[in-house]
Amino acid sequence: GCTSVNGMIYMRGQAADYDGWRQMGNAGWGWDDVLPYFLKSEDHHAGGTALHGAGGEWKVSRQRLKWDILLAVQEGAKEFGIMPRPDFNDGDNEGSGFFEVNQKGGIRWNTAKGFLKPALKRPNLRLVTHALTESLILDGKRVAGVRYRQGGRLHEAHADAEVLLAAGAINSPKLMELSGIGRPDVLKGLGI
């Protein structure tokens, strides 16, 4: 995923964005709703505080990079009203400063290291690689599994409890629509 190729910047986003999602009817998605989950999963270099967690799977470190020119840019930004921000994860990430990063000991930390590798020992998890999900298997209004192609062959995986769809911002809705989940006018236009 992107945590293996991105810039390693750790930034949660604006509290106002989360609150906006809640105001649009997405209960449980406000800043105060999601903050406990950030705290639970975080292992912050400074330890646990009201805004940061300790002991979680997601390693968050201070940047080891300090260049005089970056400090000069931060000072110059003040002249334009862009004030220093000591913590970009306090719910308001407007300003200038140094981002915290997803690293452990100066080495990239990604979701595979933090979440997947520890879970691979679970008896109810099977990792399938070199496969492409084609559609969701529905049982009435419930998603009961997935159809995927691997090595030119079509396979099915069925879930006893739940299916967690995490195919990204583009492929998650694509898979839902290919499976008949979505706005009827869009689905009809696609011949689904």
Question: What do the PLM-derived regions correspond to, one by one?
Answer:
Residues 2, 8, 47-49, 138, ...:
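Short, solvent-exposed loop/turn and secondary-structure capping segments
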Residues 2-39, 188-189:
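N-terminal glycine-rich phosphate/pyrophosphate-binding loop and immediately adjacent elements
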Residues 2-4, 15-22, 54-59, 156, ...:
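Flexible glycine/proline-enriched surface loops and loop-helix/loop-strand junctions
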Residues 2-3, 9, 97, 170, ...:
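Gly/Ser/Thr-rich beta-alpha loop segments that engage phosphate groups in nucleotides
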Residues 22-143, 149:
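Conserved redox-cofactor binding core of oxidoreductases
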Residues 136, 144-192:
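Glycine-rich loop(s) and the adjacent beta-strand/alpha-helix scaffold that form part
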